[in-house]
Amino acid sequence: MWRMPTDFRDGKTFPRRGREAIGDALWLARVADKGRAAAAGTIYDYIYPCPMDQGMMERWGISADEFNEALRRNPTDESLFAWFSDRVRDEDIRVANEWLVRERSENLDRQDAEEVAPVQSR
């Protein structure tokens, strides 16, 4: 039962990348990390739900309120994905993934470039 860190205030810890999937759903890991951090008050300078979060949720057919409730009730990725799989159709996951990869690849590339822990000086 793995839980990712959700305290991003140190500037060295980041939400998982948007390309990282839980099951077949891209972005789900990232939005879960950010939602959990927002609920804990440790989101730092991230925005939740940001326009990308909202775009994926819209394509999944769920609202931010539904997702927040699911996060509250499902503290692990495994239990969250069980809820998600029951709630979101495979076709909606496919459409959301395609939108993310085809139309938002610049955002994904920017995450990869910007969300890097600072190099420690000697």
Predicted regions and their residues:
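Polar/charged low-complexity regulatory segments
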Residues: 2-43, 93-96, 100-122
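A generic structural signal for solvent-exposed, polar alpha-helical segments
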Residues: 14, 20, 33-34, 50-54, ...
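Amphipathic alpha-helical packing elements
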Residues: 43-84
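Charged interaction scaffolds used for protein-protein
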Residues: 77-90, 97-101
